[in-house]
Amino acid sequence: MTLPFKAIISDLDGTLLNAEHKIGDFTIKILSELSQKGVDVYIATGRNLPDVQHIIRKVNVDEAMLVTSNGARANFLSGECVLNHHLPEELAFKLMNIEFDPTRVCVNSYQGDEWFINIDLESLRKYHKDSGFMYQVVDFAQHHGRQTEKVFFIGRELADLLPIEQKIRETYGDQVYTVYSTPQCLEVMNNSVSKANALEELAERIGSVSYTHLTLPTT
């Protein structure tokens, strides 16, 4: 039977992952069956590559395309990199060290295959139990901006993040793209980065799926 679509695109959190932040057996079964029928599987998420690889390897989808860090990077499940759009090193370092209230906000970065944070925040661990992907606590003033896919700020509430967003917009303007993944998480990427842009670029590069066939996320 010919399926009416050539590809499926899904996020992870709130979509493929269940309430325990794991991928369920039924979801694994459906994705595996679709892949065996020739449907291309795209995962587009704000998570980092090693985190996503561990989750998706449970599915029999050898050629899954993983769009990670909100579109800053795309790799086949095997690890082969197809695209990446890092923040400039100096800009990334400045973002990591922007002023904020450390009692209300923490700063994180995804850099290559690593996750860095300025404090140990145990509440984040539940989201990564399945993959085991874990942060490293660093002093960002002594850190570096190499291979930065995104810098993100987690606040106790939205009001804690609004001054940071305003400062970033006023200082860096169109050099960066900002988005709230949740009301408590402000994410900052290169100005060309979004899931939609990454998927469009992949469609043009790979050619197996026409851009017109893709229903694209907006972040």
What are these model-derived regions, one by one?
Residues 2-5, 38, 63, 104, ...:
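A general structural motif
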Residues 6-19:
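Asp-based phosphoryl-transfer active-site loop
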Residues 10, 68, 180-181:
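Conserved strand-loop elements at the edges of beta-sheets that form or border functional pockets
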Residues 22, 26, 194:
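Residue-level recognition of oxygen-bearing side chains
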Residues 25-124:
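Active-site phosphate-binding/coordination module
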Residues 102-214:
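Conserved acidic, metal-coordinating active-site core of Asp-based
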Residues 215-219:
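A short, hydrophobic C-terminal helix/tail in secreted or cell-surface proteins
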